[in-house]
Amino acid sequence: MNGGGANITYASRKRRKPVQKTVKPIPAEGIKSNPSKRHRDRLNTELDRLASLLPFPQDVINKLDKLSVLRLSVSYLRAKSFFDVALKSSSADRNGGQDPCRAKFGEGLNLQEGEFLLQALNGFVLVVTVDALVFYASSTIQDYLGFQQSDVIHQSVYELIHTEDRAEFQRQLHWALNPSQCTDPGQGADETHGLPQPVYYNPDQLPPENSSFMERCFICRLRCLLDNSSGFLAMNFQGRLKFLHGQNKKGKDGSLLPPQLALFAIATPLQPPSILEIRTKNFIFRTKHKLDFTPTGCDAKGQIVLGYTEAELCMRGSGYQFIHAADMLYCAESHIRMIKTGESGLAVFRLLTKDNRWAWVQSNARFIYKNGRPDFIIATQRPLTDEEGREHLLKRNTKLPFMFTTGEAVLYEMTSPFPPIMDPLPIRPKSGTCGKDSATKPTPSKDSVHPSSLLSALMQQDESIYLYPPSSNAPFERNFFTESLNECSNWPENVASVAGGSVLKHEQIGQSQEVSPAFSGDQTVLFPDNKNCDLYNIMKNLGVDFEDIKNMQNEEFFGADFSGEVDFRDIDITDEILTYVQDSLNKSPFGSPGYQPQPATALNSSCMVQERLQLGPPQQPPCRSEQATVEPQQQLCQKMEHMQVNSMFANWSANQPVPFSEPQQDLQPYSVFTDFHTADQAFPYTAAMNTMPYTQNFTPCNQTVAPQHSRCTQLDFAMGNFDSSPYPSTSNLEDFVTCLQVPDRQTHGGNPQSAMVAPQTCYAGAVSMYQCQPGPAHTLMGQMQCEPPVPGPEAFLNKFPNGGMLNETYPADLHDINNTVASTHLPPLHHPSEARPFPDLASGRLL
């Protein structure tokens, strides 16, 4: 056994090609010929005649060589001799004195029933003699191992068995499960397979045939050509040992040997097949092709699997028309391999059925020779499930440089020949606009390619075979499309109304136009024919219809969350500081006689002011004539010294602490909007600031102060609809100067000078301002002018902690400020002031 392990051989499909058979003309009379040549010719003629008598299909007979013909002939005669003895004894017992015609009819039924039993059997029948020769194997062995019936009959069974299981198989062939017993010491071991020679017994030495000692059930691994993973398939052998009659074998001395035992077993796969495998294994079919793979015939099972009749299958031309485009080059490679070696090997690909569906098959094709030359192709195909097909597709090793989805045009050295639905880049130019490339390189047609090429077979296929069925069968009616289009066009407006902002509305409209460009435009131009347009085919290929689009848009609409939308008009100060300031203002005890708290409904947030500004153009707030005199009150700045508002004073230079305060002033309240119910209330302006380490230089300025909010918050007004003002807009630090200015129309003898400042342009946009007022009132000061008589630093406040007083001149009363005056004719307001230096005023810095 050790000596045979070095030379292990397994059964394979490789066969010797037969010698070329040519019909020689009969030599004329009188011409001498070679006697050995005549003998060989007569022998070949008899072998051909003998091969035609074998019970095999013609395609199997044509591939047999001389030794195979002789081997199968002997096997057939032995099998016929056995069945003659076995069937004669059994038929005589069963029939008795029955009518011969009736008995013949019963034999026909038995033969037909046996064929059906083989198809229903999950396995194949195997008969092995005691000397390990395959006496019989059913034709269904091809479905499990891939070997033809003619390949294994009268061959050694050890060529099919794994080397590690050969000893076990020989042990099962012995009646006592002990093949080491050797009654004849002259018998040696089998040098070919390393196993001992079989022992022949007389029937008297053996137990009865129906004894339980003769039953066998074991597992063995057999060579399998259909399994690409390991090459072996574990089979379960279940049967019994029986006598093999009618063999007429002789011993070494020439004496006739009695019938010997043989294993009659049914081999079934150890792993039971799935339900789908049981369904597909019975539909192995064969097709006949020309050398260029043009189909010329198909058996009955192939017609059941594919749905074509034999005439329909043969009238379409090249067989590549039935192969999926992604598998054409893969099958062409197998075709070339078959031309070189005579056999294609296993190939898994998709075939087109009559109902335009793709069926996965596992095929093996080989040449059939006639007179030593290839005559036609026989392809054996086994249907596979979709799961098995996809698994083989993933395991497929792509050896070709181009695939269907990447390089067909390069492979065939032509521009893209595929229809728009099959083009990897389906970008088509608009009608009437053609580039230079399209003019110089025309698209190939069916007439410009070779009719027998793969490209021609691909172009002859219908586009619809590569389209998946749509998810819904609802027709694309024009009224349905119009209704869906109207519903889609109304969605952005509804979304904008929910959001309450025009910006969101424009964004939604723009987004809808970008996402659905096919819906923008004339329907009659885009969809002249709903059944033939490219968009319909693409949507049908993706399995999407208008109902699906409607559902997706509804899901996107109802799933939108507008609570997290941030408006660009939101203020920059954080919510915590706003809350702190609002609480401080609400808790501040303002005891001035003219002070009245404004209702909170008008001062909830700056959004109401923004809403009012967006509703219409701004209105000039009318000024009221009544003046409210209030007592000095402590300002909000006393509380702001304990906090920092977004680092407002981070960039200010604190050279020296300067205490300052502000005198009492009489100001006039005003209303921002005439339609507010709180606009008629009077609000004071009082300010007093504690010691703050902030100093700032300032220069004479000229500015028109816009209405200020009452809550010391930064307001960002969207002033897109406002007209630009011809008056300048300066920094926020200069807004504090205007509180000391009075109209120029009043007479003041203290300061005859007047400084003229060139006006600047006020741009319409987002106006941001800070104010320092305790009350929620809106105040508006006219344009005022601050002119120091002597250049240099001047004090802004007149009251300091050291008791120093600054005498300044203020108007006795502020006249009515009429806001109805045109902005281009507003007179400058003049305010005389007297500057006096103080010892504790280090620098003229101003907040």
Swiss-Prot record:
Q: What is this protein called?
A: Aryl hydrocarbon receptor
Q: How is it modified after translation?
A: Mono-ADP-ribosylated, leading to inhibit transcription activator activity of AHR.
The beginning of the lineage is: Eukaryota, Metazoa, Chordata, Craniata, Vertebrata
Q: Where is this motif: Nuclear localization signal 2?
A: 37-42
Q: Which SUPFAM superfamilies match?
A: HLH, helix-loop-helix DNA-binding domain, PYP-like sensor domain (PAS domain)
Region span, DNA-binding:
38-66
Q: How does it assemble?
A: Homodimer. Heterodimer; efficient DNA binding requires dimerization with another bHLH protein. Binds MYBBP1A. Interacts with coactivators including SRC-1, RIP140 and NOCA7, and with the corepressor SMRT. Interacts with NEDD8 and IVNS1ABP. Interacts with BMAL1. Interacts with HSP90AB1. Interacts with ARNT; the heterodimer ARNT:AHR binds to core DNA sequence 5'-TGCGTG-3' within the dioxin response element (DRE) of target gene promoters and activates their transcription. Interacts with TIPARP; leading to mono-ADP-ribosylation of AHR and subsequent inhibition of AHR.
Q: Which domain of life is it from?
A: Eukaryota
Q: Domain PAS: where?
A: 120-173, 281-336
**Location (main, coarse):** cytoplasm
User: What segment(s) does the record annotate as region Disordered?
Assistant: 1-39, 430-452, 825-847
Q: Does the keyword Disulfide bond apply?
A: no
GO molecular function terms noted in the UniProt entry = DNA-binding transcription factor activity; E-box binding; nuclear receptor activity; protein heterodimerization activity; protein homodimerization activity; sequence-specific double-stranded DNA binding
Please give the GO cellular component terms listed in this UniProt entry.
Answer: cytoplasm; nuclear aryl hydrocarbon receptor complex; nucleus
Q: Which UniProt keywords apply?
A: Activator, ADP-ribosylation, Biological rhythms, Cytoplasm, DNA-binding, Nucleus, Repeat, Repressor, Transcription, Transcription regulation
Which stretch carries the motif Nuclear localization signal 1? 13-16
The record, for InterPro entries, names:
AHR/AHRR (IPR039091), AHR_bHLH (IPR033348), bHLH_dom (IPR011598), HLH_DNA-bd_sf (IPR036638), PAC (IPR001610), PAS (IPR000014), PAS-like_dom_sf (IPR035965), PAS_fold (IPR013767)
A biological process term (GO) from this entry: xenobiotic metabolic process
